Amino acid sequence: MIYLKWLVLCSADWLLLLTVPLAAPVIAAFTREQLYGQYPYSWGWVWGTYDNPPQGDEGYVRKRSPFPTVTTGLRGYVNRVAWMIRNPVYGFARHYSLKYNQCYVWQVLGHDGISDKNRSPGWYFVRIRDLYTWRVVGFEFYGVFPYTKSRDVRIRLGWKMFTDKFEQRGFAPLVNTINPFDGYGDQ
């Protein structure tokens, strides 16, 4: 049943992706720079990022935004729009996240040390079951498949739960990422 639930949520997520080019310019017009470290953020409803302010994380603002280090004026507005396009519908992923529970039992298949940044290819599939009912309450598939020295296909489906942040933050956001052009290695 959890797989059907994810498929329905995934379909809704894909439909919401179509609204990002329309919503991002409007939402960016009504947001301003906010301080870092004020987690959780609540701007932008389903289009906003719960873990970073409207201008984006510090690395994005400093290096990857269209106008590096600019957070105000027209250029800051463009950076906020680009941030929402780069991180689409994070609020939706948070709203339909899997809540952490100490009574979960983890079942892991595959290699749990994979990483696109550390050049460690492979895959894993994780299921979480409720200890008392033994019902599957969540899953995650993560795969890193390099095809050149600097590029890989990165796939993450389910809920992003096989990380330290699941217990720390108390939730695992919904994910449905298939990136055929991901950078392989720390770039």
Q: What annotation goes with each model-predicted range?
A:
Residues 35, 42, 46, 57, ...:
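Intrinsically disordered, low-complexity segments enriched in small/polar residues
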Residues 72, 82-159:
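Acidic, low-complexity, intrinsically disordered interaction modules
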Residues 24-105:
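N-terminal topogenic membrane-targeting module
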